Amino acid sequence: MATYNTLQDRIRVAKELLERVDKICSRQGREVEGRAKLCGKLRAELKFLQKVEAGKVVIKESHLQSTNLTHLKAIVESAESLEKVVSVLHVFAYESPDGQKQTLVVDVVANGGHTWVKSIGRKAEALHNIWQGRGQYGDKSVIRQAEDFLEASQQQPVQYSNPHIIFAFYNGVSSPMADKLKEMGISVRGDIVAVNTIEGGEEEDEEDQEGDHEDLVEEEEDGEDDNDDDSDDTDLMHTRVDRDTIVASLAFPTEVKVDVCNRVNLDITTLITYVSSLSHGNCHFTFKEVVLTEQAAQERQEKVLPRLEEFMKGKELFACQSAVEDFRVILDTLGGPGEKSRAEELLARLKVVPDQPSERTQRLVMSSKVNRRSLMIFGTGDTLRAITMTANSGFVRAAANQGVRFSVFIHQPRALTEGKEWRATPI
């Protein structure tokens, strides 16, 4: 009966977690990258549990208590506690100190990309034992994993700042481990528990069996079971976790300090959007061109200029020579009197700099989405360590697919329409 009740509870939790993921994503107001992957893992876990329920798979009750669901639940709870979640189970590529190409799974990327979270559901006892070299062969300690996170984060800056790392513990963490993580610059969330010295080096009685059923689950959990030979800090005195003595309970940091980038590089698409007649109230038209009618409808639904102004406020504004020259050509060809007047006012606020694409930008391979003009504009922004404002999301995605991620502010596009209003139908 106990096994049956435990099984039913785990099935209920799996179903609830799927519903909670939907709520998290709807709260963000945008699609959360990795949602399908997380839901896939939850469904795989649910399917496995339902096989156990149907008698197709036989496992011990202790294994039910320590399924992959523990880690998946920790990920969901972390995402629920954070703002501006952009992705879950995101895989970042980086190079290890010896030059080897590595990948790292970040459970939750939040705060618009500025915060990386590793969610840990394993018990404090097991984590502490592994750290002291008393785990199973191949177990990788949390401290070693923290080193990987630091290495990867330094190679994945967001707006030219390294992401802030949080390790979220949902079954406690020993006080010495928490102290070590803090020394490394990593924030800790969860209950910090005391440790006691083990007389005569006796072993820990309680073994954490998390993941024992993993080979039975169709989709392997890849977030928390990193394996690597690890025996760091072997000179530590053997200690036992005292779960009953909680030293501190730490919540997620409410305010993560982010170094704000005060330099902005304007793409041609932004220059056009900023001066467009559509952006200045003249959006109540049906144009002959379908794309202009669509942009007018978007503008009536959500004005783009306030977003641009808010982002640009108090920042140093730049544009490269190529962007300005091509903008002027487009303006001379398609711009109306009001648009041209606003353009002169905007250009007077900018510091125009020579094209100076960064080294990594020049390594990009040309394609339909990656052209020379975009390389000059985004590459110059990269050299300036500025955030490039753009409506050219196609280039941003294409560059990211080649491993180059630019710091960008993406907005909806608006075309120059003043010269076409005379033959448009007012609405």
From Swiss-Prot:
Pfam families xrefs: DUF1308 (PF07000), DUF5614 (PF18474)
Acidic residues: bias regions: 200-234
Region (Disordered): 200-236
Highest taxon of source: Eukaryota
Family: Belongs to the UPF0415 family.
Protein name stated in the entry: UPF0415 protein C7orf25 homolog
Organism placement in taxonomy: Eukaryota, Metazoa, Chordata, Craniata, Vertebrata
